[in-house]
Amino acid sequence: MSRYFSFFFLALFLHYRIIVASPFEGFDAEEDDVTDDSSHLLHHSLPPPLLTQSHSSLSDPDPEPEPSSAECKSDLITESDLEHQSDSKTPSSTPFEYWDEDEFEGLPVEIETLESPLITENGTHADPKTPDLKTSSEAQGDTNDQTKKKKSYAVEIACVCFLIALAINYFVGKRENESLALAWAAKFASKDTIFQKNFSMLGVSELEDSPLLLKEALNVFKFYASGRRYCHGLLATMELKSRHDLISRVFNLVVPCKDEITFEVYMNEETMDHVVFAMTKKKAAKTMQKEMRDLQRFAGIVSPPAGRKWVSEEFALISESKEVAADLITDTVLDQVFGDKAVDKYGKNFMSMHISDQHPGKHKKMMLFKFSLPDAKHMDDIVRLVALIPYYIDLVGRYRLSSQARNKTESGRQKAAEEAYKELHNARQEALQKKKAEKKKMMEEAEAKMSAEVIRKKEAKERARQVKKAVPKMKMSRSH
């Protein structure tokens, strides 16, 4: 009877050991799932133990005590709980699939999910809320590189756009200046125009097919005419805005300037009398008198005469005498351009007029007219101004001073000639003194480099020359 009880207790003990060991050894698949799920539910409350890979099959020297039946029952989870938990969350595969689970006994398997902490390269768990310093520094470096590239691209794009604007403005401005010059030539230098009627030869050469305009620069054009009495010829110079230069164009928007044309008439020496006369705007009268040497020396600002029709109040006259001013400002000129009634319409482009027989330069007897150019569509505004040129060529060529005015002008010119001679003589003396001083300095520097023997010989030679110079010369004569 005792033998039967022994077998019964032995079987009961073995059965109990199998039931208790199955959740830890992973032999039963269904119980493994239950254990995995239970460990997944409890992994937040229990700190994860260190995972070490076993290299031997040695048993643990300190085995854990066997759990009681109550503890085993508390670890079991029903099938309904498993189904409910599997519907709410699906666990992901473990990151250590290459490990053998049989080698880890008595340890809950921690399943890595999307919500589990990140594992870094050194095996430590990283907080997903804490940014990686290396990753953040690389991202910041990439952002800085992209910002620098954008800035460099912006500078390059701006430079390319500026170059394109320069090129476009160059061709457009060049075309505008050429169109303006051709419009002037078509209005005043073509067939049946003012210059064609008053001069026998037009253009830059004597050939029949010679061009009318000479282009010296992108904004400078010249026109030449000759073959008229009282003068050698006429040279017109158009100085236009630098429209081809983008910077000059922008500067002109801030400081406006005008297109100008200057006429230089070279008078014959024998036809032009003693005349120094100028006319300009009142604001520029004093400046013009200071800049022009002949006006500064011979002429002064003339006040308007009483009881006579005169130029508009916006003009000022600079003349050698009142007689010359009265003779050159005729009623025809006042009615056509410079009078109060005509100046607003026909004289708005007038800048200055200068007539002188003492003009500084190669040609002394000259007449200069300076006008502002309108645009190509309004060339009719300066028709009467251009007509003044042939009118004054004839007027000044025929003009003769009275005896009283001539004596006054001759005395002034004689005095000016003496002053000019003195200035020239003083300039020559200064140049000669400067040359002597330089020569003396060079000789002193050369003597400083000589030896004592050379200096002694030179002094002896100089004394002999002085003695020879002091001896009176005797002239030998032969008597017959």
Swiss-Prot record:
- In this chain, composition skew of type Basic and acidic residues spans 407-465
What does the record say about its membrane topology? Single-pass membrane protein
Bias (Polar residues) occurs at: 133-144
Gene Ontology, cellular component aspect: endoplasmic reticulum; membrane
Gene Ontology molecular function terms on file:
calcium ion binding
| Compartments it resides in | Membrane
Residue stretches of biased makeup (Basic residues): 466-480
A Gene Ontology BP annotation from the UniProt entry: endoplasmic reticulum calcium ion homeostasis
PANTHER family for the chain? ADIPOCYTE-SPECIFIC PROTEIN 4-RELATED (PTHR12883), PAT COMPLEX SUBUNIT CCDC47 (PTHR12883:SF0)
Protein name per the record: Uncharacterized protein At5g49945
| Gene source species | Arabidopsis thaliana
